[in-house]
């Protein structure tokens, strides 16, 4: 069992396989060109798997593949099959923007993928293009349809932005409700790489919009293993809101992140990291596990978004850590 310095059980590993992304979303990616990490500096699938295998042996129950955009890395289904074949009952999931998903969904499902989280901030073509800096909506919707068709469990992630997509909150909710998908609205997490002036809706503003049509929704008892607070409409449909600005958001954090370069990240907000790259490439797996335990001991109690200070902006590059 893996325990951090505050007694929290850590059983969830998020693995970024690439920092590259084919979108330039306002809340995540810088607009100006910059240098990607050279591909030869990334851990191979084999080395990533060595660490995942050891982490599972130490008590990890859930593995999520992230990016950047993970579907940009070739042979991702091969990598997922490696993990699935080692531990068939592992909770194996993927986070994606959905743009390439229609061609990959069946391969991923056949490889052992169980669930997929897909970003959908709007159902308006022009708004989607404004957010992603690219014409994306049609292909994202095709990806969602194909993932559903092949039997992947789907959650939709939506980051409502003030003055951009706040008018689309109800439409996204209705889209998911009609298809039986869970939707989670995510408060914008201020970060160094977001577009200047980007502002998100807070949880109260999101709830106020939903209450315009569904005034009698109620709060659901929180599942401490989930970052979202869920709410239930009168017909039983549940939606979630992820609230990183709330004081208790980090209280039950159960996750650790591994970047494609081999850095272990204890917290999405902070820059602190330690590398397991040399250890896994040298097959010193015990050393990699010791680094993991050391990183967990350094895991902070909470992020700084909860201080409700507009100056608290994370310098973490979210596209490298998968959010």
Curated annotation (Swiss-Prot):
[4Fe-4S] cluster 1 binds at residues 21, 25, 28. Belongs to the radical SAM superfamily. MoaA family. Pathway: Cofactor biosynthesis; molybdopterin biosynthesis. InterPro entries: Aldolase_TIM, Elp3/MiaA/NifB-like_rSAM, MoaA, MoaA_NifB_PqqE_Fe-S-bd_CS, MoaA_twitch, MoCo_biosynth_MoaA/MoaC, rSAM. Catalyzes the cyclization of GTP to (8S)-3',8-cyclo-7,8-dihydroguanosine 5'-triphosphate. HAMAP family: MoaA_B. CDD domains: Radical_SAM (cd01335), Twitch_MoaA (cd21117). Residues 302-313 have a biased composition (Basic and acidic residues). Monomer and homodimer. GO terms for molecular function: 4 iron, 4 sulfur cluster binding; cyclic pyranopterin monophosphate synthase activity; GTP 3',8'-cyclase activity; GTP binding; metal ion binding; S-adenosyl-L-methionine binding. The keyword Transit peptide does not apply. NCBIfam families: moaA, PRK00164.2-1. This is GTP 3',8-cyclase. Its cofactor is [4Fe-4S] cluster. It catalyses: GTP + AH2 + S-adenosyl-L-methionine = (8S)-3',8-cyclo-7,8-dihydroguanosine 5'-triphosphate + 5'-deoxyadenosine + L-methionine + A + H(+). Residues 5-228 form the Radical SAM core domain. GO terms for biological process: Mo-molybdopterin cofactor biosynthetic process. Residues 302-323 are annotated as: Disordered. Its EC number is 4.1.99.22. [4Fe-4S] cluster 2 binds at residues 250, 253, 267. It holds the Pfam family Radical_SAM. Keywords: 4Fe-4S, GTP-binding, Iron, Iron-sulfur, Lyase, Metal-binding, Molybdenum cofactor biosynthesis, Nucleotide-binding, S-adenosyl-L-methionine. S-adenosyl-L-methionine binds at residues 27, 68, 119, 189.
């Amino acid at each position: 069992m893996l325990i951090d310095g505050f007694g929290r059980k850590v059983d969830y590993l998020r693995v970024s396989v690439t920092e590259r992304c084919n979108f330039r979303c306002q809340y995540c990616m810088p607009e100006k060109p910059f240098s990607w990490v050279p591909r030869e500096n990334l851990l191979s699938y084999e080395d990533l798997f060595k660490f995942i295998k050891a982490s599972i042996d130490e008590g990890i129950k859930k593995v999520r593949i992230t990016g950047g955009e993970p579907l940009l890395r070739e042979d991702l289904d091969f990598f997922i099959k490696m993990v699935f074949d080692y531990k068939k009952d592992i909770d194996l999931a993927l986070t994606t923007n959905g743009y390439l998903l229609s061609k990959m969904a069946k391969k991923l499902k056949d490889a052992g993928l169980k669930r997929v989280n897909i970003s959908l901030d709007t159902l308006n073509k022009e708004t989607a293009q404004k957010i992603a800096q690219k014409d994306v909506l049609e292909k994202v919707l095709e990806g969602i349809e194909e993932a559903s068709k092949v039997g992947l469990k789907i959650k939709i992630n939506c980051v409502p932005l003030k003055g951009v997509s706040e008018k689309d909150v109800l439409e996204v909710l209705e889209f998911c409700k009609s298809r039986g998908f869970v939707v989670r609205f995510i408060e914008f997490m201020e970060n160094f790489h977001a577009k200047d002036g980007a502002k998100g809706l807070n949880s109260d503003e999101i709830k106020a919009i939903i209450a315009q049509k569904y005034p009698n929704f109620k709060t659901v008892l929180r599942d401490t293993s989930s970052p979202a607070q869920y709410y239930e409409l009168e017909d039983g449909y549940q939606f979630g809101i992820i609230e990183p600005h709330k004081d208790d958001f980090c209280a039950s954090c159960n996750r650790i992140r591994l970047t494609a370069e081999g850095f272990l990240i204890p917290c999405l907000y902070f820059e602190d990291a330690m590398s397991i790259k040399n250890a896994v490439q040298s097959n010193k797996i015990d050393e990699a596990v010791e680094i993991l335990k050391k990183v967990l001991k350094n895991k902070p109690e909470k992020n700084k978004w909860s201080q409700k200070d507009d100056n608290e902006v994370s310098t973490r590059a979210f596209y490298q850590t998968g959010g």
